[in-house]
C-alpha cells in the first residue's frame, strides 16, 4: 500500500469525505471537540465506514505544519492530472470552457487560494508547469477549503506545447501583463478561454507570453502597482463569470 498522507482542516477533510471517500482511511479528532461541524464529519465518516479516533492536540500539532482545527485524516495519496487528461475534460465540458494557467506560482498558499477561486468561478481546471510550480500538499488543500478535491490540477511538462494544443482545439489564450494596452474589462471572455497568471514580480515567462492571443491588464486606481496573484486571479475569473452570466440572460 502506498504511504498515507495527512490532510488537515475541517473543510479539506469534509470535501474528501464527500467527493473521494475511498481515499480516507482514518480520521483523528482532537480530544473534547464535539461541535456541529465535527458531528457532520462523524456522520459522513459513518456513512462511508471510515474509522474515527481521538488524539491530543499537541500530538496533532506534531503531525502537520499548520492550523489543523482539531481534524486530521490519514488518506491515500492524490494524483495530479497529466496533460493527456485535458482532452477528456474538454470533451465533458457543457459550455465554453474556462481554464486557469498559473505560470511559475510557487507559493503553496497562493496555489490553494487560486484553486478555491477557480472552483468558485466555474473553471474547468487549473494548469501548472511541472517545474517551478507549487503542487498539491496538505497546506495547499487546507487553504483551498475543499476545492482541491473538486477541481482538477493538471501538471504539464511543456506549457508552451500544451497551450498550442489547446489553441488548436479552439481556445483563446488571454495573458495578464501590467503593461498591456487593453484592460481586463474590455476583453471578451465569453468564449472558450484560457486565462494565464504569471508569478508575482516576474509575470509570465517569455515563451508563455509569446503564445498569448491577447494581453490584458487590471486597471489600478491607487498607489500600489500590483496585486497578490491569488487576488488578481479572482478578479480575472469572476469577470469571466460575470460576462458569461450576462450573456446567458434573455
From Swiss-Prot:
GO cellular component terms attached to this protein's record = cytosol
Question: Which keywords does this Swiss-Prot/TrEMBL entry list?
Answer: Cytoplasm, Methyltransferase, rRNA processing, S-adenosyl-L-methionine, Transferase
Where does the UniProt entry say this protein principally localizes? Answer: cytoplasm
Protein's name according to its UniProt entry: 23S rRNA (guanosine-2'-O-)-methyltransferase RlmB
Q: Where in the cell is it found?
A: Cytoplasm
Task: Name the InterPro entries on file.
Answer: 23S_rRNA_MeTrfase_RlmB (IPR024915), Alpha/beta_knot_MTases (IPR029028), Ribosomal_eL30-like_sf (IPR029064), rRNA_MeTrfase_TrmH (IPR004441), SpoU_MeTrfase (IPR001537), SpoU_subst-bd (IPR013123), tRNA_m1G_MTases_N (IPR029026)
What the entry lists under Pfam families is as follows: SpoU_methylase, SpoU_sub_bind
Gene3D superfamilies attached here? 3.30.1330.30, 3.40.1280.10
Q: What does this protein do?
A: Specifically methylates the ribose of guanosine 2251 in 23S rRNA.
Top-rank taxon of the source lineage equals: Bacteria
Reactions performed catalytically: guanosine(2251) in 23S rRNA + S-adenosyl-L-methionine = 2'-O-methylguanosine(2251) in 23S rRNA + S-adenosyl-L-homocysteine + H(+)
- Any idea which positions bind S-adenosyl-L-methionine? 198, 218, 227
Coiled-coil segments on the chain, per record:
none
Q: Which organism is it from?
A: Pseudomonas syringae pv. tomato (strain ATCC BAA-871 / DC3000)
- The EC code for this enzyme is 2.1.1.185
List the molecular function annotations (GO) for this entry.
RNA binding; rRNA (guanosine-2'-O-)-methyltransferase activity
Q: Which family does it belong to?
A: Belongs to the class IV-like SAM-binding methyltransferase superfamily. RNA methyltransferase TrmH family. RlmB subfamily.
Amino acid at each position: 500500500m502506498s504511504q498515507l498522507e495527512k490532510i488537515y482542516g475541517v473543510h479539506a477533510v469534509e470535501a474528501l469525505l464527500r467527493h473521494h471517500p475511498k481515499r480516507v482511511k482514518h480520521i483523528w479528532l482532537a480530544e473534547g471537540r464535539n461541535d456541529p461541524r465535527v458531528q457532520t464529519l462523524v456522520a459522513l465518516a459513518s456513512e462511508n465506514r471510515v474509522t474515527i479516533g481521538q488524539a491530543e492536540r499537541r500530538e496533532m500539532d506534531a503531525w502537520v505544519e499548520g492550523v489543523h482545527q482539531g481534524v486530521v485524516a490519514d488518506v491515500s495519496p492524490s494524483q495530479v492530472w497529466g496533460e493527456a487528461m485535458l482532452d477528456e475534460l474538454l470533451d465533458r465540458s457543457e459550455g465554453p470552457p474556462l481554464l486557469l494557467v498559473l505560470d511559475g506560482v510557487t507559493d503553496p498558499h497562493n496555489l490553494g487560494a487560486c484553486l478555491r477561486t477557480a472552483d468558485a468561478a466555474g473553471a474547468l481546471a487549473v494548469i501548472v508547469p511541472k517545474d517551478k510550480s507549487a503542487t498539491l500538499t496538505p497546506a495547499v488543500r487546507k487553504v483551498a477549503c475543499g476545492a482541491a478535491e473538486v477541481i482538477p490540477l493538471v501538471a504539464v511538462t511543456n506549457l508552451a506545447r500544451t497551450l498550442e494544443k489547446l489553441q488548436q482545439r479552439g481556445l483563446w489564450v488571454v495573458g495578464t501583463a501590467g503593461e498591456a494596452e487593453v484592460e481586463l474589462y474590455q476583453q471578451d471572455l465569453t468564449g472558450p478561454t484560457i486565462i494565464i497568471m504569471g508569478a508575482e514580480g516576474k509575470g509570465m515567462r517569455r515563451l508563455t507570453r509569446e503564445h498569448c492571443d491577447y494581453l490584458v491588464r487590471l486597471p489600478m486606481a491607487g498607489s500600489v502597482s500590483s496585486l497578490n496573484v491569488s487576488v488578481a486571479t479572482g478578479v480575472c475569473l469572476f469577470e469571466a463569470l460575470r460576462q458569461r452570466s450576462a450573456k446567458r440572460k434573455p
